[in-house]
Amino acid sequence: MSDQKFISIRGAREHNLKNVDLDLPRDKLIVMTGLSGSGKSSLAFDTIYAEGQRRYVESLSAYARQFLEMMQKPDVDQIDGLSPAISIEQKTTSRNPRSTVGTVTEIYDYMRLLFARVGIPYSPATGLPIESQTVSQMVDRVIALEEGTRLYILAPIVRGRKGEYRKELAELQKKGFQRVKVDGTFYEIADVPPLDKKYKHDIDVVVDRVVVRPDLSTRLADSLETCLKLADGLAIAEFADKPLPVGETAEGGSANKSANETHERILFSEKFACPVSGFTIPEIEPRLFSFNNPFGACPTCDGLGTQQAIDPNLIIPDESAALKDGAVAPWARSSSPYYNQTLEALGKAYGFKVSARWSELSEEARQAILYGTKGREITFHYDDGLRSYQTTKPFEGVIPNLERRWKETDSAWSREEIERFMASTPCPACNGYRLKPEALSVKIGKKHIGEITEMSIRKADAWFRDIDGSFNEKQREIAARILKEIRERLQFLNDVGLDYLTLARNSGTLSGGESQRIRLASQIGSGLTGVLYVLDEPSIGLHQRDNARLLDTLRHLRDLGNTVIVVEHDEDAILTADYVVDIGPAAGVHGGKVIAQGSPQDIMANTNSLTGKYLSGAMEVAVPAERRKISKTKRLRVVGARGNNLKNVSADIPLGTFTAVTGVSGGGKSTFLIETLFKAASRRIMGSREHPAEHDRIEGLEFLDKVIDIDQSPIGRTPRSNPATYTGAFTPIRDWFAGLPEAKARGYQPGRFSFNIKGGRCEACQGDGVIKIEMHFLPDVYVTCDVCHGKRYNRETLDVLFKGKSIADVLDMTVEEGAEFFSAVPAVRDKLETLVKVGLGYIKVGQQATTLSGGEAQRVKLAKELSRRATGRTLYILDEPTTGLHFHDVAKLLEVLHELVEQGNTVVVIEHNLEVIKTADWVIDLGPEGGDGGGEIVAVGRPEDIVQEKRSYTGQFLKELLERRPKRSSQAAE
């Protein structure tokens, strides 16, 4: 095969790959699929991408290499036909509060440039545009007036300020000026009446009197320059023969006119300055619109748009609690009598008892406790059992006291404690727009840059397409190239189904799928060709409706002349690929081989391919024969949810069932389920400090005793955390080893078998198994510890064996092997078997938590929940649990979730995967669109009911799925 047309891989052995040889066609859309843990990512990311990136970086100078991440050389004999590689992974973009969708996609950078070049500043006082002018422009403006027009050229030296101004007038006389206009009247300087210093005055110096004619330019330029020097960049041309109507002058009662404005006048400014309010803007440059730059950032919030402030709702989390029982949350933990005695003294002054509930207190008493007595003195009696004393002073108030301590303390612990009672509120100075008033006064089409970032991408796209209609010829020419860049980028974000996001949205709040698609849009914007792109499940979090747009985008990337490799489980993606590689046959040690390759039809025809069987319909996730009965009485009811884009939504979730919350991306699913239901329920039932989104109430919580959100956040942030420690299997493993005869003879306790504490661990690497060596031009190298050879424990600890295996050998087993090895030890076996149940039999017992994907971390948490004793009164909430799962894994996961429901629990999932939705007992479909166009309940009921609803996109695709499976299996058979 010619190298040019193929990427040929020989002998790939990274992770679990079994010496894989593979030829992939270049410039095609290639999908790699297979069970979770079968080796897809090992081949796509750890072999192909790593080698492509490593070769590219290696070709750079040593100086350039130090700034780039250098990849380890993968375990492979040879790869030919590679291009420079770009990987677009699942990781959430950035936790930096300054990073927004606009900054990540670079759209905001182009917007800053656009506003700096064609934006017009408006005066906040008059609402009129303010422009900086050169002297030549001022002269041209005057010369353009009708010939013979009589004008006074004035320098406004005092504008609405108190004072006598004797000294200033004397100075002017010395400089040779003769006339001034004071408070609306012209005087010779010598004849100006004494000014009352208690009142505001206006003084304009008469620099020249002119009659407009063509040869006036030189004289006029000199006069205007004199004005600009005298009046700090301002000059006035006043029409001598055009007095204003009396009602429009200051004397006639007009509030926004100065006393000197008696005639029509033209105001010139060589700076961007509003001549009325004195509001000035220095030069208008792109940095003025950057909230990451002191020139543009709002000085109050430093460009963050929010401020941390004590939230009264967190101070009093439960209004039905009595004061003596800890209604005031920051005081509730203290065992000292001080706080109770403080409340008793306040009670005497404001007429309440400490046995009263917060809800029973008068508004005045509540204000006094929260915000202080505002100077009113209270007599406090204190007695702590050792001494008693009395003091009379105003009470500071719980909130001012916490704010003061937060500002003054040096203790990180104290700050953290107080921050538990703080919430983010929009900055009052910039209203959350992050910028200085100067930046927000610059507008295009009556909107400032902050208002545009608040629009959804769909609306912003329409706005930028229409805006050049309001430009003049010069502005249109300047803006053309900038607008092209902005429009293209917005179009790509639209194409990957992110039209509901706003440009101001914080990057840290995006899901993994959203941040990956944003990076994908940025890549298309860069328009590279001849590149190898490797993507990791870009369809995560996308509704079937938007999937077609995403696949178009991937094809567009291919058509530019790139090779696109996608690790994906989505049926449509597999069917649209030019080439499919199915890796398996199973996970972990049982995987790592290429089972089938070729066109989607070849995969379906291959009897060894599990993926092929699901695609052809030979195997499928079964629809339950009958759905669970829906109880009329036992149900949760969310009433009046209004968070984010929800439009006063009320919905029932039947208890003891499997419910799916569906809808297009941005429809309001997470706001409804996580931000409203989970946070409110965990606050009521578990006493958490979560702050739910706005809603009226939640009914039916009395049927629950626990609510658990099983999300995709990491199970631990250090390499020391692993599935065994997280699920609690490691404790019985250590106990078992400590109970062995050899360990007892040596007097070893369970702590001896921990790699986190001194005693049993290898001290050379402190139980890490590797030692980090910093290299400056190369990646940091982790060298296996030469004392313990990566085993983490010292020799004495490793001498203790069970069935010929040490504790280090156990940590190196896969979960499946571990469950078999400990088959006689139920405490260990049961915990490991739950991991096998959720499809994680392939991961190592001691695998570092940092190497688990989001979907794997979520399933480890699910396994931990499964291994707990069932109470049957728990509400489990899962956000897209099928992330990273093959059809076959989805079938297994559904068994687990339905098992939880069989125990009497309630499981609610946010899900786009139709295989999951069709097995649900109850479906709540939100939408119909994303962002502003969503937030309503479109359909609710059993899957069969959803299919009937014309407005439901989910229903349309579900109907198609239920109808097309039988058709396809007959085609595959042919």
From Swiss-Prot:
Subcellular location: Cytoplasm
Pfam families recorded: UvrA_DNA-bind, UvrA_inter
GO MF, any single term: DNA binding
Domain ABC transporter: 331-610, 630-959
Residues the record lists as binding ATP: 34-41, 663-670
Major localization listed first in the record, in broad terms: cytoplasm
Highest taxon, organism lineage: Bacteria
One GO cellular component term noted in the UniProt record for this chain: cytoplasm
GO biological process: nucleotide-excision repair; SOS response
InterPro entries: ABC_transporter-like_ATP-bd, ABC_transporter-like_CS, ATP_grasp_subdomain_1, P-loop_NTPase, UvrA, UvrA_DNA-bd, UvrA_inter
UniProt entry keywords in alphabetical sequence: ATP-binding, Cytoplasm, DNA damage, DNA excision, DNA repair, DNA-binding, Excision nuclease, Metal-binding, Nucleotide-binding, Repeat, SOS response, Zinc, Zinc-finger
Assigned protein family: Belongs to the ABC transporter superfamily. UvrA family.
Quaternary structure (record): Forms a heterotetramer with UvrB during the search for lesions.
Identification of the protein by name: UvrABC system protein A
Organism: Brucella melitensis biotype 1 (strain ATCC 23456 / CCUG 17765 / NCTC 10094 / 16M)
